[in-house]
Amino acid sequence: MAEYKDTLNLPNTSFPMKASLSVREPEMLADWQAKGIYQKIRKARVGSKRFILHDGPPYANGHLHCGHALNKILKDIIIKSKTFSGFDAPFVPGWDCHGLPIELNVEKKVGKAGSKISPREFRAKCREYAASQIDIQRDEFQRLGVLGDWYNPYVTMDYHYEANIVRALGLMIKNGHLQQGFKPVHWCIDCGSALAEAEVDYEDKTSPSIDVAFSAVNPSEFLNCFGTQPAVKPLILPIWTTTPWTLPANEAVCLHPEIDYALIDAGNSYYIVATDLVESVMARYGISHYKTSGSAKGRVFEHFKLQHPFYKRQVPVVLAEHVTTESGTGCVHTAPAHGPDDYLVGQSYQLPLINPVMANGCFAENVELFAGISVLKANETILTVLSERNVLLASESIRHSYPHCWRHKSPMIFLATPQWFVSMDKSNLRQAIINEIDKVNWVPDWGKARISNMVENRPDWCISRQRSWGTPMPLFVHKTTRELHPDTLELIEKVAVMIEKSGIDAWFDLDSSELLGDDAKHYDKITDTMDVWLDSGISHYSVLKHNNDLDFPADVYFEGSDQHRGWFNSSLTTAVAMYGVAAYKTVLTHGYTVDAEGKKLSKSKGNYVALDKLVNQHGADILRLWVASTDYRHEVSISEEIIKRNADAYRRIRNTARFLLANLFDFNPASDCIDAKELLELDRWALKRCQLLQEEIITAYENYHFHLIYQKIHNFCAVDMGSFYLDLIKDRQYTTAKDSIARRSCQTAMYHMVKAFTIWLAPILSFTAEEIWQTIPGNNSESIFIEHWYDAWPTIDAVNMEDWEQLHIVRDEVNKALEETRQRGEIGSALAAEVTVYADAKALPKLTRLGEELRFLFITSEAKACPISQSPKGLAVTDCGVSIQVTASVHEKCARCWHRREDVGQNQEHPELCLRCVGNISGYHEERLYI
């Protein structure tokens, strides 16, 4: 055999089987950066239609995790696929830089602003810290193969951006959406600041569950409503609460106007509770003997007076729709300073809005009984006071969902404080937003209902914060009237210009008289900063509308599902408030990263998968394949086992590319491509299959169905290529003459296929695709990412794809029969066998048409097809309507092609060869038509 090895066209390539991604990827990344590949991509698409995917800014704090990788890789896949589709698709990454997490990290190092360090110095340290985090994250994002304008990102702490935040506030004021108010807001005691809805997490908490007696000041007026004769015993409206610390702020008891309330005679006292809750309430109070003495609607008790349980003041009965009979008593404790529903009721009844709690979470010194006590520790004291006054009707502990600070994980409180709000209803903003939601394409479609519900139910947006590191609210309010300065809009622009030059310190350092002159003595300068969700939310204004490479509105916003209450919401609200339209045309949402069992990733649970470890161990392309392989619309599972499965799939893809490249080692596209009319039918089938598959893949990219692309490519490698085409062409590729039509036909097809295949891969397996691209013979562009979807297909005659589908099916059945024969020990390899296929009228013509080439379909030494009527008795008929007979060949094996042929040894000069091989090494070009 040794003397004939050199006569074979054995594959050869510099493209390695072992990927060594952790070594090659950084080298390729450095090459992209050195060559300015991103800039060259943009240059190649100058004048093309733009596609804008606007990047939601991650927070500049800490190393990236798998959730970051999922998000940025998905975006990168979209950008690259759009570039291949001919769009000019710039990608400008962003970072969110103000806010509490950065403050907390800086505080650990230098202390709180205003104590060990001045606020100005503190802000400088925050800016310095955020910049260092951006550098870390920039490198980590680029390591994932994400292309973009990484050294010209948008950064919310840039002076230009900060100035535009201020200008955006001015636009919202101009349009009538800003209002100030003393309202209850989510308040984090640890932060010392108000928080927005998006900064609140709901977690389980154990709280006291108590029932408290509010006694009627005049029982007779209540009893008269039931038509009951007055009696000399107390009448109680019991309330139920899980926040006893709010009782000092109680100003009313609220009933539902249309709920039926029962008068319960319990012997020593009367109780009024919702009819539907009588049984559960009496059981809770341990009262087994009672009777119902009447029923009345809640509305009849309006304005009746009750005695506060431990203060001398009397409080009214008020009415509201938020009262339910799902739990409690149907009588709701109402403290306008400590809840949004309570506040609204208080406003409608003009109840006192008295806040007994200070910003540090402690009761003020003038609060009777509880002065100086933290509200987080006050419940026990309050229960003692209630017990001493015999008004505690029931008490137990319950586990329930309760708002917590997203950063500190500590329980929050509702606290009435002077704040600034974007009013959802003052200028009909809520309805305008809902109207815009209908115009947006939401993927998945449940996103529309989710954000609609949030907008419909959200309170006014509290945008003021009591923090140091944030964009200031550059407002002046009159010391007496508390009205904004009449020249507010002009003043805001002046401050914006100052911030653009010197940053936010320009406002904090400003003496009011510099802008107001003598008027300064009449106005207070606001020191609040703005909600960071407003910072990122106005990126449509500061970035899309101010960057000439971008457009407004964006084609796509794409973030995790938590951003329906975060960035999607703040972007939508601000855009509609500023110019009346949504900031985006389409919103895509991906799920969270979870472990293999669907549980949240956590270091404490031991299921956390470190991103840097994955990248260093497996390579970024394996991670990118993981992203593409999952349906991102649901939760996305990750584990070492899942990554290993993706690594296996990657090897199949890489080996497919390597096989194609290895068989093009002596192929020059400029001189060796043959005319389409000369292509063998199998090659024409393969090219047609690729063209059809490319259409499916492009459609899937356009629809953002990346998991379908993964499936299609994997199936193409495993089935169309691995188990069919590449298997069939080996004999022709290796044994026919180097320059024969048969071989060049195959190489021509493989050349077109590998170019198309590599571009399909490129949005997903970016590093590997570039590596393949640089190995493909011919004059290729500097980078694959400058290319379009492959369109240099040869024009081929119609191929009967159904015929080849049938041949593929029959081949699979033959392979099963060969394997069974091998298992019985009758043959070794398939080339040791001869096959007869007995086929029905549908399959027979397709098989006989191949003639002598039928054996190449089965990779056996001999093959023939006969009518099924000639099938020997007892030979099973397969599902595809054929019977298969396998026999061991009795002929000698050709030392070159390994086929067992009757003519082996007939040539005296080459006694070990079949005559076909003799011809191929003697300059005779073997003719093939089909395979």
Curated annotation (Swiss-Prot):
GO molecular function: aminoacyl-tRNA deacylase activity; ATP binding; isoleucine-tRNA ligase activity; tRNA binding; zinc ion binding
Lineage: superkingdom: Bacteria
Compartments where found: Cytoplasm
Cofactor or coenzyme needed: Zn(2+)
Stored SUPFAM superfamilies: Anticodon-binding domain of a subclass of class I aminoacyl-tRNA synthetases (SSF47323), Nucleotidylyl transferase (SSF52374), ValRS/IleRS/LeuRS editing domain (SSF50677)
Residue ranges of the motif 'HIGH' region: 58-68
Binding site for L-isoleucyl-5'-AMP: 559
Any one of the GO CC terms: cytosol
GO BP, sorted A to Z: isoleucyl-tRNA aminoacylation
Residues that hold ATP according to the record: 603
Leader sequence segment: none
Function as written in the Swiss-Prot or TrEMBL entry: Catalyzes the attachment of isoleucine to tRNA(Ile). As IleRS can inadvertently accommodate and process structurally similar amino acids such as valine, to avoid such errors it has two additional distinct tRNA(Ile)-dependent editing activities. One activity is designated as 'pretransfer' editing and involves the hydrolysis of activated Val-AMP. The other activity is designated 'posttransfer' editing and involves deacylation of mischarged Val-tRNA(Ile).
HAMAP family according to UniProt: Ile_tRNA_synth_type1
Full protein name: Isoleucine--tRNA ligase
Species of the source: Legionella pneumophila subsp. pneumophila (strain Philadelphia 1 / ATCC 33152 / DSM 7513)
Gene: ileS
